[in-house]
Amino acid sequence: MSQFSHYNEDGLPKMVDISSKSATSRTATAECRVRISPRLYEAIHEQSLKKGNPLPVAQVAGIMAAKKTAEWIPMCHPILIQGTDLSFKYEPVKDGYMLVIGATVTVDGNTGVEMEALTAVTAAALTFYDMCKAVDKSMVIEETLLVKKTGGKNGDFYHPRREKMD
């Protein structure tokens, strides 16, 4: 028998059977940061980007990606997501601004939604980059992380680098 949960007795990949797990309310919140130049920040706020406002498009991309996570990540189970919400805020940093993208995904199910939240913020960041690259190709997508998760057999998790959120 394989010592790894995602490999069968022949050593080949398999999807774990979650049918015996209890359905519970679960949430996951992820975050991704995109470092941008002052020039790009100004262009966004002056609404002078040729492609238009990047945030609504990034928001839709994040929601769509959360729903398609099982198609992107081989061992993720397709799940019926109850909700996905994204947030965007700019923070001033040395030499520019940081766009902080957050995503919270909820489900009542027998597996968690951590990967869905992480996929949502990643897709939103990539879409933001695509919408803005004509002005600033030096953007840096950085620090993608799971901020918190609630529910499930293993209980709640709060990333040690973030304050505990209620």
Swiss-Prot record:
<dbReference type="InterPro" id="IPR023045">
    <property type="entry name" value="MoaC"/>
</dbReference>
<dbReference type="InterPro" id="IPR002820">
    <property type="entry name" value="Mopterin_CF_biosynth-C_dom"/>
</dbReference>
<feature type="binding site">
    <location>
        <begin position="115"/>
        <end position="116"/>
    </location>
    <ligand>
        <name>substrate</name>
    </ligand>
</feature>
<dbReference type="GO" id="GO:0061799">
    <property type="term" value="F:cyclic pyranopterin monophosphate synthase activity"/>
</dbReference>
<comment type="subunit">
    <text>Homohexamer; trimer of dimers.</text>
</comment>
<dbReference type="InterPro" id="IPR036522">
    <property type="entry name" value="MoaC_sf"/>
</dbReference>
<dbReference type="GO" id="GO:0006777">
    <property type="term" value="P:Mo-molybdopterin cofactor biosynthetic process"/>
</dbReference>
<comment type="function">
    <text>Catalyzes the conversion of (8S)-3',8-cyclo-7,8-dihydroguanosine 5'-triphosphate to cyclic pyranopterin monophosphate (cPMP).</text>
</comment>
<comment type="similarity">
    <text>Belongs to the MoaC family.</text>
</comment>
<keyword id="KW-0456">Lyase</keyword>
<dbReference type="InterPro" id="IPR047594">
    <property type="entry name" value="MoaC_bact/euk"/>
</dbReference>
<keyword id="KW-0501">Molybdenum cofactor biosynthesis</keyword>
<feature type="binding site">
    <location>
        <begin position="75"/>
        <end position="77"/>
    </location>
    <ligand>
        <name>substrate</name>
    </ligand>
</feature>
<feature type="active site">
    <location>
        <position position="130"/>
    </location>
</feature>
<dbReference type="InterPro" id="IPR050105">
    <property type="entry name" value="MoCo_biosynth_MoaA/MoaC"/>
</dbReference>
<protein>
    <recommendedName>
        <fullName>Cyclic pyranopterin monophosphate synthase</fullName>
        <ecNumber>4.6.1.17</ecNumber>
    </recommendedName>
</protein>
<dbReference type="Pfam" id="PF01967">
    <property type="entry name" value="MoaC"/>
</dbReference>
<comment type="pathway">
    <text>Cofactor biosynthesis; molybdopterin biosynthesis.</text>
</comment>
